[in-house]
Amino acid sequence: MALIVQKFGGSSVKDRDRIFNVARIVANTHNAGNDVVVVVSAQGDTTDDLIAKAGEITHNPSAREMDMLLASGEQISIALLAMALNELGCHAISLTGWQAGFRTDRAYTKARITRLETERISSELERNRVVVVAGFQGLNKLDDITTLGRGGSDTSAVAIAAALHADRCQIYTDVEGVYTADPRKVSNTRKLEEITFDEMLELASLGAQVLNNRSVELAKKYNVELEVLSSLNPIPGTVVKEVTKDMEGMLIKGVAKDTDVAVITILNVPDEPGMSFRIFGLLAQKNINVDIILQSTGRDGKTDISFTCAEGEAELAMRVLKESAHFNDVSVDTTCAKVSIVGAGMQSHSGVASKMFEAMSNNNINIKMISTSEIKISCIIDRADADKAVGAIHDMLFD
């Protein structure tokens, strides 16, 4: 007998037929003699619909009340799935995030898990029940409901797998695994049999929507192997693990784009020690995540600094720079995107960057900023060119 954690996204439970499809997958796993914990997201576009409803009431809802509202989406999903499982003769019980033992910090709408009290889950498993848990949510020290942010259900599933020392953690999506690019946008993609935690973490943080990056961080920390599978097609998917069999195989594992990018530029910054700390320290205090940073060569005691952040954080970043750091010559560009290639094989092979740049040159795509690491190369380009860039780079590297 194995203990298996299965997570299903919103598209997998979006309507009655999909719910019963998921119920059959879970029931088959349980009937094979396994203990099963299921983590479920809100149905379809429920979260977006709830956000829209809040917008009908106020343009500035409190983060606490937003968490109270958004957590209701998962509660609908878990109840319906538990009903479907019981209808199939598979004893199941639904638990909210806090009933399942998720405790978080006080960062409403983007809370982090501080601990997981597994007694209730373990008790229900001992009664031979399938435990259906609401992902994305928990309870803080004030006994307030909190949510983990977009993709938080993946993180919930990995946390349960780590805490219970599960034999498997299966993440079911609407695609059949991890591909070298988004198969819905690029025609000649390849499905990966395996990918390392580090490679998957880079792809997830770059906008590949198969797995949430926080869930991959957690899986890497506790060495929880993940299986990415399709809820609609019962074929082998992709295993995410510490070391893969083909470490000396494919140089590049994926090409990804991220359109949630803004480029902020500060002109005429005093070229003196401590200025970078002043700027980015203030941004860090506001929890603004900065990605690529570019500083020009100083002239006449002045320099220019550009950096990227999420588009949704650009307005706050501008306000911090103007009001707290007292910079007046600040501009923002929200027409950008980031395209990246990821692969551990780049560490020991030359010429990969050249091919990436050649692909964009051949398609008249201008590169505005470049960032590199041991396993990643990223370029900031015009957002309108993002899909074309991904396709061209993929063709260059994988054909």
Language model features with spans:
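Acidic-aromatic/histidine active-site loop/patch
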Residues: 219
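A conserved regulatory-domain signal marking ACT and ACT-like small-molecule sensing domains
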Residues: 236-399
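Short hydrophobic alpha-helical runs that function as membrane-insertion/retention elements
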Residues: 168-172, 226-228, 291
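Short phosphate-binding/catalytic loops that engage adenosine nucleotides
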Residues: 34, 90, 224, 288, ...
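Glycine-rich beta-alpha junction loops
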Residues: 43, 175-177, 222-226, 230-235, ...
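Non-catalytic alpha-helical coupling and interface elements of nucleotide-dependent molecular machines
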Residues: 55, 59, 90, 223-227, ...
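Nucleotide/pyrophosphate-binding catalytic subdomain
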Residues: 1-216, 308, 381-382
